[in-house]
């Protein structure tokens, strides 16, 4: 599908651990235009998730969630052995307020994690028509390696300590529990 131009980019992630309450495989598809996304919708009518009948026989559940990419950034050097941390959230404020939260609270942290050399990239998505879904937004963190992921807690603490010097960032940090609810994080590897 990528070679036909219907899909601009795809990423296939597999959860590292067995978890009956979460997904085993996550496929992120980027469409180059709304028209191409509409073509995919037509494809899904005949082939759910784009899978043929033989593949569908192997699957017990499929869910499709249209998402909008709100923000993203990447380090100048790509990860050689990336590890993905998928963080689903439900936001409890208006979409505009949540987008401001992503811009003013999450983005400075993710930029710091990239600067510290542990994060290769991040993407922040908001679900379309998220009512009734298990989550309404997703933060996709691509760590450079397992070693980089192991430094996560220390790097988060270091970056947040720097950011707390900014009173506006600190105010958002202090009130973040009223903005979103974090769901179960999923550690995943990419199928290449």
Language model segments and positions:
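Short S/T/G/P-rich N-terminal loop/turn motif that feeds into the first structured element of a domain
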Residues: 1-49, 54-163, 172-192
């Amino acid at each position: 599908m990528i070679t036909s131009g219907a899909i601009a980019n795809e990423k296939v992630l597999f959860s590292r651990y067995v978890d009956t309450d979460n997904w085993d495989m996550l496929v992120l598809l980027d469409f180059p235009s709304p028209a191409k996304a509409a073509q995919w919708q037509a494809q899904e009518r005949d082939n759910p998730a784009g899978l043929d009948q033989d593949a569908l026989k192997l699957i017990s559940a499929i869910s499709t969630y249209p998402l909008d990419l709100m923000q993203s950034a990447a380090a100048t050097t790509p990860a050689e052995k990336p590890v993905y941390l998928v963080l689903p959230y439900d936001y409890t404020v208006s979409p505009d307020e949540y987008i401001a939260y992503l811009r003013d609270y999450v983005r400075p942290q993710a930029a710091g994690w990239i600067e510290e050399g542990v994060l290769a990239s991040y993407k922040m998505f908001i679900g379309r028509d998220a009512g009734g879904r298990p989550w309404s937004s997703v933060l996709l963190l691509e760590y450079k390696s397992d070693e980089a992921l192991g430094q996560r807690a220390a790097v988060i603490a270091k970056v947040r300590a720097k950011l707390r010097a900014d009173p506006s960032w600190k105010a958002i940090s202090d009130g973040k529990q009223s903005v979103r609810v974090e769901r179960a994080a999923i550690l995943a590897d990419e199928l290449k």
